[in-house]
Amino acid sequence: MNKSFTLSALLVLFAAPAMADDLSKYQEESRTVATAFVTQLIGENKKAVMEGGPESAIKVCKEIAPKMAGDVSRKQGWKLTRVSLKVRNPLLGSADAWEQKVLMDFEKRIAKGEKPESMEFVEIVKEPAGNSFRYMKAIALQPGCVTCHGAAEQIPDAVKARLADEYPNDKATGYAPGQIRGAISIKRTL
């Protein structure tokens, strides 16, 4: 038997459990970071609404959330973003090809009855620059979020005016509570 083939086969055999352990570890770390990010974002939105009304939440999503994502990315050494198929800010929220595929898969899973609160996806992706661990956690629209992301009749006039001013090409409306608004996406180079 070819010695190099045997050595390669043994390396794969022994490396597979280690890779699975790493994948589970990365998934748990990513889940923890994504959950903390969403919890903090919801808290910031609630605080803004209490202090300045519903249109104040727009500033949270436009200015505070990207800063929070940048802070997490720098601290962890990963890239954390919020992505969607229906973006409000195409510069920050547009999904790449892999993220689009996962978001469409989330939609299929929700159609089959899976709860969005626990929906996530992980994969090791081979890219030109090397392998990356990719993680996504679905963001389900919360009841209070319809004020900015709901059907046209659910959005107050002051919020509509502010959205039209801030986001003239806004596509992030028409959602109902429980639908997937987007996802937290984490990418880390391996």
Task: Specify the residue positions occupied by each region the protein language model found.
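Bacterial N-terminal signal peptides that target proteins for export
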Residues: 1-7
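Extracytoplasmic c-type cytochrome modules immediately beyond a signal peptide or single-pass transmembrane anchor
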Residues: 21-142, 154-190
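Sec/Tat signal peptide C-region and signal peptidase I cleavage site
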Residues: 16-20
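Bacterial N-terminal signal peptides
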Residues: 8-15
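Detector for the c-type heme attachment site
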Residues: 146-153
